[in-house]
């Protein structure tokens, strides 16, 4: 039966050769333009000895069967075995040491390591050499003539600028370097010229094209352009941190409207067209622990008992967590009774919404029920429950019973709902929550004509989100918001990796290129002289007051000393030295 919820975008001829796919890297001078410089399940929900009778529960005592290619599952109105969860034996938490848990950069570098940046640097320089070897354009010159090989430090500054552009948003990339008063961002010009940024963006590359093998589907060939980076980051996500007991598997979509063999359509998502990911998140925090890119047929997936691709995707994502008592929450696209049974046999609980047209769903549940009623059927460790509250919802669970509890609805009024529904709502939204946190920092720009560069931008944002989640777990008393964490991370990246004067602007130098007075001459600290109103006056330290505290608020610190030559209040140690030796402090 066709799936009305998800359908693929019609693709071009599947016989397109490898050369055509690699042609996306062809150099186009039009790419440049002139720049104007917890696990809160209640034990009462798991009453294993008996099921509490409910007046509105339909229990006719009859049994129901469902067939599946000759095999059948016998469902009954009463649980034949105790309903209980597996003991959780996992060891959740961060697995890699951090020397300073208050430093956002150290969390980011848990994932974005020197090894990864070195690989990107190597491939970017190789791509630049390839582009520079091509004949110049119609005007007789190429902007690649101005290329100089990049290094790890410059690329990290480049990534910091990309992150900053997600916060300080402008409709056109060139506007970040415009000198028009309405658009001026002078600090960005101090960090990197627009021309250099565009050159780096044009040459940004992640894999040698000659290593991309043919003989696969178009989608799989395309994915190889970013696959080493994707695999590296996903591996880091899963080795740096182990999630808590409750996890969720769902689909995520990265917006992309250009031609792409992997492009999908998901009408239920906020972004409906683009690159589809299958994501495993920690339910409590939204930490992205594992992910797969949808490439259609030929995906490297684990086998499943029912043979369904959706089941194979789930088993692939949770494979390293099996046997430890985890509980995975799933949406109806990924659910079948046989998948739940297979997970349960691997000491993993499962909860999720189910489609009535799935095989092995009890026939009793396919009948309509009245609003406010609940009907449940049991088969071994499985429970299938149907509940109607305006709309009919069917649930599967390996440990819930048909307990109904009282909760507050959106209007604050008391209402009754099955416990399985309540637990599902509390734990299933992790992937959508992570997507929502990323929407404030969009990577969608007209410059992203090449899909894998946009996907890299998306992976960069996911890495920052995971870094923030770990930071919050290690600093529960901190009130630093996601936006302030990003700002602090960008500041630390620039402080550590930016080399003043590394890239110069074209034409006449602006005042930013002139060595400031504070970096030359003779400077000595002196006490701020007394005034008629104050015997011991103080001033705000220039360095301290430019920093932020652990809560993301600006620091205010008074000092008795100042530089007489610069007439600037400064703490003697260490701010006086910093102010007179660092161009960007």
Curated annotation (Swiss-Prot):
Lineage: Eukaryota, Metazoa, Chordata, Craniata, Vertebrata
Disordered: annotated segments: 1-73
Biased composition (Acidic residues): 25-40
InterPro entries (alphabetical): PGBD (IPR029526), PGBD4_Znf_C (IPR032718)
Coiled coil, from the record: none
Gene: PGBD4
Compositionally biased tracts (Low complexity): 62-72
Protein name: PiggyBac transposable element-derived protein 4
Basic and acidic residues composition bias: residue spans: 47-61
